[in-house]
């Protein structure tokens, strides 16, 4: 079947990517010389995907230039701070058909997208040994029949998915039924999928290691792009390193500090001189 469009989800705050995600949306981070979301848009266009939609929320204004540069369309998700990514699926409900469902912060070393796709699937890589990722098994027909959070020696969810028109209609029907339930707000769309494997038929698209990357933290990005070890492109981290008279690479183990909702109030980190906290609102640096 021919692909109708691609939905790139870019509404979330990516608080674990502190402090870079406080200064700039994670999708706008430069990775190996390319803006993360621009690389994905180019790969979709190279595959001749006719329509590309970006679902925005946090720092939505940073995506405006993509309209003119690439001819993509933006859809705003007003609930990005109070709901998980099921709200981005809901925001795109009128355009879901034969659709790629993508995350703005994935990096594909090779182009995984195709103009024609046989059936719905979720991209996966294989874990040798234990993993905390979402692991899948398949039945004799190749359809996903179990999904567990954590496992070992298993294929795990990594990257994009493809929904055909029938899958989209079934999923949206289920989502509509549960959307206003309080427990739904915090769920990933994948969690809803897990609860309906009997009716939401999807296969595993298996990729070799080194094909799909995601960066949840600065440390993970530094492993992939070592230029970030001593040049984080972060005004905040440059100020911190100057104030402490250390190199940026000496700022490690960064963790967000939450302020009671989904946004971060600052971050904590380790340095050669001890453990510190930095607060965004007043640019305060405190040693613990």
Task: Give the role of each language-model region.
Residues 1-22, 71:
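N-terminal nucleotide-binding beta1-loop-alpha1 segment
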Residues 231-251:
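Short, non-transmembrane alpha-helical segments in secretory-pathway proteins
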Residues 46, 52, 60-68:
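Nucleotide and nucleotide-moiety/phosphate-recognizing core
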Residues 64-134, 140:
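Conserved beta-loop-beta/alpha segment of the NTase-like Rossmann-fold superfamily
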Residues 4, 50, 97:
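Short acidic/polar active-site loop segments enriched in Thr and Asp
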Residues 109-184, 255-288:
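Conserved core of the sugar-phosphate nucleotidyltransferase
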Residues 34-51:
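A short, N-terminal amphipathic alpha-helix
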Residues 143-212, 219-238:
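Catalytic-core segments of class I nucleotidyltransferases/pyrophosphorylases
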């Amino acid at each position: 079947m021919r692909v109708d469009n691609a939905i790139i989800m870019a509404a979330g705050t990516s608080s674990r990517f502190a402090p870079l995600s406080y200064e700039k949306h994670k999708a706008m981070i430069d990775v190996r010389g390319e803006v993360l979301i621009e690389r994905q848009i180019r790969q979709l266009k190279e595959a001749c995907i006719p329509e590309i939609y970006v679902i925005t929320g946090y720092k939505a204004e940073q995506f405006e230039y993509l309209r003119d540069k690439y001819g993509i369309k933006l859809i705003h998700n007003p609930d990005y701070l109070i709901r998980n990514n099921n709200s981005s699926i809901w925001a795109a409900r009128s355009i879901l058909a034969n659709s790629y469902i993508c995350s703005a912060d994935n990096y594909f070393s090779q182009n995984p997208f195709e103009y024609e796709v046989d059936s719905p699937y979720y991209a996966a890589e294989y874990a040798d040994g234990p993993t905390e990722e979402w692991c899948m098994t398949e039945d004799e027909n190749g359809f996903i029949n179990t999904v567990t959070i954590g496992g070992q020696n298993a294929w795990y969810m990594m990257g994009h998915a493809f929904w055909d028109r029938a899958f989209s209609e079934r999923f949206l029907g289920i989502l509509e039924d549960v959307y206003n339930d309080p427990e739904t707000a915090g769920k990933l769309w994948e969690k809803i999928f897990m609860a309906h494997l009997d009716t939401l038929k999807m296969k595993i698209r298996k990729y070799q290691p080194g094909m799909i990357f995601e960066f949840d933290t600065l440390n993970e990005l530094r492993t992939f792009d070592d230029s970030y070890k001593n040049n984080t492109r972060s005004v905040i981290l440059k100020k911190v390193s100057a104030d402490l008279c250390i190199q940026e690479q000496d700022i490690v183990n960064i963790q967000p500090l939450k302020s009671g909702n989904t946004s971060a109030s600052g971050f904590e980190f380790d340095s050669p001189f001890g453990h510190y906290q930095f607060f965004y609102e007043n640019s305060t640096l405190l040693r613990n």
